[in-house]
């Protein structure tokens, strides 16, 4: 199973990457803080991930166990269409970025899962060079932007713009879904139609 969305970034704030992380931080049907971690620990999955590309964000899963496969589909579908990001701003702050003060004499710093992940990515000279090449070759396209987020620009992303990006791109008519394997595809499609 795979659900993906066209998510072209208009800047380098990393909004698509931050949403990829945050939709997996609980949803309407699965209100636990981090269902992704729970799935990794308790599922029979053979593949479970989420990835942000320059023009799309994808959520693939695989399992040889039919019951587990259905459960994984349910968790991922609810995560992308009914995430807790609208209820809890803290999810955005934790996974995206926030200001932090260790003590009253320390400088204010920026922290966040995606922010720190991308600081690591930007520490590689090869990656910096490749990003500059894409920016030079395709200046007026989505490839000129850093879909994962540039640490310099990530703090420019507001909570409101982040939610607007989810509303704009995370709906069924902007998604592509595929199923592969030994299963009753009509049954899965009926379930998706009924539930989402």
Question: Where are the language model's segments positioned?
Answer:
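Betabetaalpha-Me/HNH-type nuclease active-site subdomain
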Residues: 1
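Short pre-active-site segment immediately N-terminal to the catalytic Zn-binding motif
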Residues: 4-14
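Short N-terminal amphipathic alpha-helix/helix-capping patch enriched in small hydrophobics
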Residues: 14-15, 32
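Charge-rich, well-structured scaffold segments of protease-associated domains
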Residues: 8-9, 22-196
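Active-site His/Glu-centered metal-binding helix of metallohydrolases
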Residues: 15, 19-23
């Amino acid at each position: 199973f795979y659900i993906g969305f066209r998510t072209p970034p208009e800047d380098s704030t990393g909004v698509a990457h931050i949403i990829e992380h945050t939709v997996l931080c609980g949803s309407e049907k699965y209100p636990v803080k981090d269902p992704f971690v729970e799935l990794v620990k308790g599922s029979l999955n053979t593949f479970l991930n989420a990835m942000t590309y320059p023009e799309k964000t994808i959520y693939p899963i695989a399992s040889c166990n039919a019951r587990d496969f259905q459960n994984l589909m349910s968790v991922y579908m609810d995560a992308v269409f009914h995430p807790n990001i609208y209820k809890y701003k803290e999810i955005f702050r934790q996974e995206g970025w926030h200001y932090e003060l260790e003590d009253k004499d320390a400088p204010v710093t920026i922290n966040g899962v995606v922010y720190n992940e991308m600081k690591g990515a930007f520490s590689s000279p090869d990656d910096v060079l490749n990003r500059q090449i894409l920016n030079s070759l395709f200046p007026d396209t989505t490839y000129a932007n850093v879909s994962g987020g540039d640490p310099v620009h990530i703090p420019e992303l507001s909570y409101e713009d982040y939610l607007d990006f989810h509303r704009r791109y995370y709906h069924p008519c902007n998604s592509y879904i595929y199923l592969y394997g030994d299963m009753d595809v009509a049954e899965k499609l009926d379930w998706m139609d009924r539930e989402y």
